[in-house]
Amino acid sequence: MKKSLVLKASVAVATLVPMLSFAAEGDDPAKAAFDSLQASATEYIGYAWAMVVVIVGATIGIKLFKKFTSKAS
């Protein structure tokens, strides 16, 4: 019983180790695609922050304009 369990475990390890090392080698197209997606997302986040600054600045400007025009009237 114990030998059978050890034999099964060693066979499982012997089949998994080459598969894991094969998966770690070479250029992975999925990794390249994910890296490209991550670069695009970073670029879009930069654009979004620029838009946030513009929108917040415009909102503050409009509120200040309304405040000063109501006091001037």
UniProtKB/Swiss-Prot annotation:
InterPro entries, sorted: G8P, Phage_M13_G8P_capsid_dom_sf
- Please tell me whether the keyword Protease is annotated for this protein: no
What span is annotated as the signal peptide, if there is one?
1-23
SUPFAM superfamilies linked: Inovirus (filamentous phage) major coat protein
Quote the subcellular location field of this record.
Answer: Virion; Host membrane
Keyword line: Capsid protein, Helical capsid protein, Host membrane, Membrane, Signal, Transmembrane, Transmembrane helix, Virion
Q: List the disulfide bonds.
A: none
Q: How does it sit in the membrane?
A: Single-pass type I membrane protein
Would you identify the family this protein belongs to, as annotated? Belongs to the inovirus capsid protein family.
Please state what the protein is called. Answer: Capsid protein G8P
